[in-house]
Amino acid sequence: MGAWDWIRFVIYYVSFVAILIGYTWTIVLFVTGNRYLRRLRDHPPGDEEEYLWVFLVPALNEGVTIADSVARLRAVEASHKVIVVINDGSDDDTGEVLDGIGGPDLEVLTRVPPNARTGKAAALNAAFDFVRRQILAKPAYTAFDTDHVIFGIVDADGRLSADAPTFVSRHFQDLDVGGVQVHVHIYNQSSWLTHMQGLEFTIFGGLFQVGRSYWGTAFLGGN
């Protein structure tokens, strides 16, 4: 065989092996995912009342959506919860909207330049410090030690299932668990593009994440 024949031969078999590995890995994830789900169904629901649920909502110019976001989180079924909105240097009416919907369950962390608008990670880190130093020091929350405080990160346009704490809390009964990734759905699947995006999240969460959970190797995703 000539040089080009050998090159085509190598490319063909490398591609064949890669495809075979991909299909095999998909089947393995499907099998392990089903085993994990069966094991999970046998696990009793957790007691969400044991925990303080702290929902962190990064917000930059979310004046149109932030009131609805807070209302949705207020509808989440958690006995002990606090909603922390991080107003990350907004120059619209986000701050005014938050002032109008205040309550004992809502805390607002207002960031201003030069610290504001330095990225979502920086905003969340500031919120963690704010919760630790100020919120957990309040008499209403001093009964919760750090092992019984669960942070939930929710985008301003996100929707968390009302019964999520009941399902999530059972995972934290295992002290080796440090975080839980919930399944993500696209709720406005009104176009072909958003429908395909929803399918992507379904495959990623329902196959890859669940399959990896069997070995305890699932990871936290986000933007």
At which residue positions do the language-model features occur?
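A conserved acidic beta->alpha catalytic loop
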Residues: N87-E96, R111-A116, R159
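Acidic helix N-cap motif at the loop->helix transition within catalytic regions
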Residues: A67, D92-G100, K120, D163
